[in-house]
Amino acid sequence: MYLVDTNVLSEARRGRPEARDWLRSVDPDQVFLSVVTLGEIMKGISQKTRTDAAAAVSLHRWLEQLRVDHARRILPISDEVALEWGRIAAMRPQDMADALIAATAAVHRKTVVTRNVSDFKDLGVAVLDPWNLG
């Protein structure tokens, strides 16, 4: 089962074939999201609102559809995830969102699907890069 990073969802939305085709090839019931990913997307929408309100509205519709499509497969930050995040955060400096996604993947035994493999290297989670499947 897979925990999909924000960059894969964003690139699939933009029609990037690597991300789009990978998502289409996987059973939807095997695809999970972190609440952190929802927050990252909302941050982007909020920033976009300042420069392009119409694009922000479109992105917000997309976010709401993601929430509907993955309603039973959105993973929270539980106490177990928080404890795992603390362990991971002590390993090396890193982005808090990535560390929380890694902790979520570790606790729920999911493979992180991301283009940013180096962000998850040596954090104790399996990683899959749809841009480098060969």
Report residues per predicted region.
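Short, hydrophobic beta-strand segments that form beta-sheet elements in well-ordered domains
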Residues: A12, T111-T114
